[in-house]
């Protein structure tokens, strides 16, 4: 399991700890990842994802997982999230047609 957000592609970054004497030591900046279960209203099912706390705030701000994925850039999404986006779009298209 990689340390990458499935919705925003936030990943591990590297940098330096810098002391008062300007000594530099390598370090890693880890994203704040949380395991969450989000509800897809279009698919009527629960979806487990590993996303950053920032992405969780964005999902809630946009009004849920379906709305977030509708606006999300495909390049940033994980393979699972891309599949979800397609399924949700297909389901919404069926509902509009019916």
Swiss-Prot record:
Coiled coil: none
Example GO molecular function: structural constituent of ribosome
Keywords: Ribonucleoprotein, Ribosomal protein
The keyword Ribonucleoprotein appears for this protein: yes
Cellular component GO terms, alphabetical: cytosolic large ribosomal subunit
Highest taxon above the source species: Bacteria
UniProt xrefs under Pfam families: Ribosomal_L28
GO terms for biological process, alphabetical: translation
The keyword Ribonucleoprotein belongs to this UniProt entry's keyword annotation: yes
Family annotation (NCBIfam families): L28
Similarity comment: family membership: Belongs to the bacterial ribosomal protein bL28 family.
Protein's name according to its UniProt entry: Large ribosomal subunit protein bL28
Organism: Mesorhizobium japonicum (strain LMG 29417 / CECT 9101 / MAFF 303099)
Organism phylogeny: Bacteria, Pseudomonadati, Pseudomonadota, Alphaproteobacteria, Hyphomicrobiales
